[in-house]
Regions:
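Central hydrophobic cores of alpha-helical transmembrane segments
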Residues: 1, 83-89, 109, 120-131
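Hydrophobic alpha-helical membrane-interfacial segments at the cytosolic entry of transmembrane helices
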Residues: 1-11
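Extracytoplasmic catalytic-loop and juxtamembrane helix elements of membrane-embedded
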Residues: 11-42
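Alpha-helical transmembrane segments of polytopic membrane proteins
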Residues: 26-30, 53-60, 150-163
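Aromatic/glycine/proline-enriched transmembrane-helix motif characteristic
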Residues: 30, 34-94, 171-197
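Hydrophobic/aromatic-rich transmembrane helices and adjacent perimembrane loops
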Residues: 100-117, 129
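Aromatic-enriched
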Residues: 121-197
């Protein structure tokens, strides 16, 4: 936090409007094209105001974090750090109103460390990598031979479903329903726990 303040405080004091712009934009914008809210909107005609999305996404994220905390405290074994990080980041991405392409990178390392099931992780990564080009192709519009929204929606739903599938595997792993290969390979300890092990 000291580094964050050291970098941000001078900029915020000298250029307060510019410094607040990201926060202003994020508060006022609607759902980004590759979120579940946009998929629902395109397919049902429902519209979501920025105020609703801000409130709903925050409440949903906090509720999911509380559920993850309860799960972590009550699981059959102490969860590994990577498992908890994956679940929290996945929860944020799935309920957030914005999903910029770089946000998916936040899941790569936790997914690789929490779930050594490479086929599932690579399947998600491949589908996720397709979302951006499909979005660009869709944004061309039908007059310019852009793809219909249904193809983009299938990619978005597939990406989200694979993220949820990985979360389910991780939860099953935490509850002792499936073998945790990482824990087994490290003498039943969490290699990321350090002094907290």
């Amino acid at each position: 936090s000291v580094a964050w303040i050291a970098v941000n405080a001078p900029v915020a004091m000298k250029y307060p409007d510019a410094w607040r712009e990201f926060f202003r934009l994020n508060q006022e914008r609607g759902a980004e094209w590759t979120t579940i809210y946009s998929v629902l909107s395109r397919n049902t005609g429902m519209s979501f105001s920025p105020e609703f999305l801000n409130t709903f996404s925050l409440v949903a994220f906090l509720a999911l974090c509380a559920a993850i905390a309860v799960l972590g405290l009550r699981s059959a074994r102490t969860p590994r750090m990577a498992e908890l990080v994956y679940l929290i980041v996945a929860a944020f991405l799935l309920v957030n109103k914005v999903w910029s392409p770089q946000y998916s990178l936040w899941l790569v390392v936790p997914a690789a460390l929490a779930l050594p099931r490479w086929r599932l992780v690579f399947s998600w990564a491949l589908v996720d990598a397709l979302v951006w080009p499909l979005l660009m192709w869709h944004m061309l519009g039908t007059d310019n031979k852009g793809i219909p929204h249904e193809l983009l929606d299938v990619a978005v739903i597939s990406r989200d479903a694979l993220i949820i599938a990985m979360a389910v595997f991780i939860i099953r792993q935490m509850c002792g329903k499936v073998t945790d290969k990482v824990r087994d390979a490290h003498g039943s300890s969490d290699p990321l726990a350090g002094a907290f092990a």
